[in-house]
C-alpha cells in the first residue's frame, strides 16, 4: 500500500459486523498509519459497522434456516459474541448494543419469540467484569432450566477460526453435555457462502450510495 494508490475512491470495510473500539477502531487506526506519507489520497469511506444491514441479517438467518432444514430445531438458539470488558460499554462503546440489535433482528427475521433465543458473550479472561451473560456459565445452567437441546451461532465472526471451532464448537459443548444437556449443535459462520459474498457487496454499495447522495 505504501508504494502507490490508484482510483478516486476507497471504501474500507473490515470483517467485524459490530463496531468495537478494540477491533474496528484499531483496524482503522492501523490503516491510517499505513496511509501516512502518501503523496496523494483517494476519497475514503469507512464502513464502521454493518450489524443491522438487511443483507447481513438475512445471511445469518438463512444459515440458521438451512441448519434447521437438515437438523431440525432445538429448544434454544444461542447467539454468542466475542466478549469485552464491561468498562468499554460504560465508556460509550456501542459494541454491546449492536450485538443485541443483531440478535433481535435475526430473531425477527426467523419469527422467534424472546423465549426462543438468547445472546451471550464468550472468551473472557483476566479479573475485570466482562459483558454478560457469559457463554460458558449460561450453557452450564441451561439444562437445569429445562433446555436439553441447543444450537449456537457466532454472528460476530465472518469466518470460522480457533475461537469458534474449538471454544464454541468443542469446549462449550462439553460444558453443556456435562451439565445434563443432550444435544448441542454449532452452526458455522458465513465463511465463503454466496449469501456472505452478497452481503459484503451490498454493504459496499450502500457506502458508495451514501457518499454520492450526500
Regions found by a protein language model. Name each.
Residues 8, 13-206:
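Extended amphipathic ligand-handling, pore-lining, and cofactor/metal-binding catalytic surfaces
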Residues 1-9, 204, 211-214:
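Single conserved hydrophobic/aromatic residue that forms the stacking wall/gate
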Amino acid at each position: 500500500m505504501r508504494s502507490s494508490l490508484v482510483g478516486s475512491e476507497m471504501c474500507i470495510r473490515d470483517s467485524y459486523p459490530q463496531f468495537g473500539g478494540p477491533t474496528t477502531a484499531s483496524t482503522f487506526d492501523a490503516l491510517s498509519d499505513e496511509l501516512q506519507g502518501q503523496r496523494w489520497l483517494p476519497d475514503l469511506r469507512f464502513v464502521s459497522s454493518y450489524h443491522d444491514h438487511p443483507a447481513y441479517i438475512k445471511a445469518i438467518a438463512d444459515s440458521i434456516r438451512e441448519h434447521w432444514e437438515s437438523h431440525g430445531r432445538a429448544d434454544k438458539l444461542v447467539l454468542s459474541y466475542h466478549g469485552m470488558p464491561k468498562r468499554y460499554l460504560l465508556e460509550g462503546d456501542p459494541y454491546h448494543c449492536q450485538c443485541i440489535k443483531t440478535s433481535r433482528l435475526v430473531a425477527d427475521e426467523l419469527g422467534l419469540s424472546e423465549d426462543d433465543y438468547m445472546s451471550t458473550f464468550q472468551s473472557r479472561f483476566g479479573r475485570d467484569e466482562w459483558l454478560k451473560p457469559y457463554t460458558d456459565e449460561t450453557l452450564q445452567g441451561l439444562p437445569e432450566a429445562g433446555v436439553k437441546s441447543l444450537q449456537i451461532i457466532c454472528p460476530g465472526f465472518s469466518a470460522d477460526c480457533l475461537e469458534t471451532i474449538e471454544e464454541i464448537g468443542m469446549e462449550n459443548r462439553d460444558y453443556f453435555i456435562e451439565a445434563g444437556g443432550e444435544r448441542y449443535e454449532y452452526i458455522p459462520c458465513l465463511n465463503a457462502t454466496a449469501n456472505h459474498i452478497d452481503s459484503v457487496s451490498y454493504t459496499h454499495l450502500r457506502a458508495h450510495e451514501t457518499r454520492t447522495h450526500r
